[in-house]
């Protein structure tokens, strides 16, 4: 009996680690198979802590965007891939030191990308919109970005903001 309980608990733990969900009022975000994402590499912190912080910051920003939805509407998103702008390199490779530190170097060729499915639900639970998105912003360094240059994930947030405003334009006009 003890073995069965341990096996069941291990299975539940494995399922939870493969799929992280965040729910806050008008939006629910599920980060699916995060170990297979293209690029969520930290520069100078543990991989686990960096992923948690990155997902939390994007979750909080999506909550902020969803506040503009009409009362009763809920956005459900399942993120299947994330590729942050730039690449992580040893600091010595980019000419800013010779220590063991890493840095994320942002160049125009390393564009931000995010893949997800979404559903926008009405107050009665009916599906108002749904779809699959593979967002990428090839002009991320050239376009207007309302975020401060010191803000984390500013390119990814700007890409999500532009998608949100375009995708839900009709819904936002009604609120």
Task: Cite the ranges covered by each PLM segment.
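Bacterial N-terminal signal peptides that target proteins for export
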Residues: 1-8
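N-terminal signal peptide c-region/cleavage motif recognized by signal peptidases
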Residues: 13, 17-18
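N-terminal segment of the mature soluble domain
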Residues: 22-26, 31-84
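Short secondary-structure boundary motifs at beta->alpha junctions and helix caps
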Residues: 44, 130-162
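Soluble non-cytosolic domains of exported or imported proteins
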Residues: 45-57, 105, 109, 150-154, ...
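Surface-exposed short loop/turn segments
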Residues: 79-122
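Residue-level signal for glycine
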Residues: 125-127
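Short, low-complexity, Pro/Ser/Thr/Gly-rich segments in the mature regions of secreted, periplasmic
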Residues: 164-175
């Amino acid at each position: 009996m003890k073995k069965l309980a341990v096996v069941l608990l291990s299975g539940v733990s494995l399922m939870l680690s493969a799929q992280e969900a965040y729910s806050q009022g008008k939006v629910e975000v599920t980060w699916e198979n995060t170990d297979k994402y293209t690029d969520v590499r930290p520069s100078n912190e543990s991989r686990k802590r960096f992923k948690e912080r990155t997902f939390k910051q994007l979750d909080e920003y999506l909550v902020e965007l969803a506040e503009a939805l009409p009362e009763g509407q809920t956005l459900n998103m399942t993120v299947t891939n994330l590729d942050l702008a730039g690449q992580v390199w040893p600091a010595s490779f980019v000419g800013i030191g010779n220590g063991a530190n890493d840095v994320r170097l942002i160049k125009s060729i390393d564009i931000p990308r995010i893949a997800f499915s979404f559903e926008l639900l009405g107050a009665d639970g009916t599906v108002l919109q749904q779809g699959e998105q593979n967002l990428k912003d090839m002009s991320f360094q050239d376009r207007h970005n309302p975020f401060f240059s010191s803000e984390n994930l500013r390119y990814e947030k700007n890409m999500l903001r532009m998608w949100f405003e375009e995708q839900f334009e009709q819904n936002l006009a009604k609120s």
